[in-house]
């Protein structure tokens, strides 16, 4: 989907964020638009956004690094988020995560060699009563056990 995209030009970055300039507090919507377009927030966007919004580069970078969902590199075709919060841990999430990462041969934030899936930690999906929980491309799945995880991995082509 987004892997191995060339770095966008300043003009391309400006064209993506221009429709959002009239918003109050446009930085977050701009970052989301850039990530939606390129699968990440391109490094070259930081000085462009700083210039457009009259902010320091450090301020823009600080916002990007504060929010865990913003990435500086593209993900796989699918994103699998595994809950790391206490309720899920008490229901076996740590063992499930370790086994999932072992099966895929990657670590946290890693992408499978075939580019199919990136695995990321998330801290609470709001599914505590159905722990352990996961999210696949924005779809929340509860009561994930080894068998269900195997089905999820097959579904995303891992």
Task: Locate the predicted segments by residue.
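Signature of N-terminal electron-transfer/Fe-S-associated modules in redox systems
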Residues: 1-158
């Amino acid at each position: 989907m987004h892997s191995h995209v060339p770095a966008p030009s300043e003009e391309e970055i400006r064209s993506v964020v221009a429709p959002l300039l009239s918003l109050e507090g446009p930085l977050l919507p701009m970052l989301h638009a850039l990530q939606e377009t390129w699968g990440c927030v391109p490094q070259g966007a930081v000085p462009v956004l700083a210039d457009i919004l009259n902010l320091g580069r450090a301020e823009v970078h600080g916002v990007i690094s504060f929010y865990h969902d913003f990435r500086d590199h593209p993900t796989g075709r699918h994103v699998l988020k595994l809950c790391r919060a206490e309720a899920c841990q008490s229901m076996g999430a740590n063992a499930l995560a370790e086994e999932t990462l072992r099966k895929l041969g990657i670590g946290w934030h890693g992408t499978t060699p075939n580019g199919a899936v990136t695995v990321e930690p998330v801290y609470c999906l709001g599914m505590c009563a159905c722990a352990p929980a996961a999210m696949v491309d924005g779809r929340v799945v509860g009561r994930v056990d080894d068998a269900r995880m195997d089905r999820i991995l097959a579904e995303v082509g891992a």
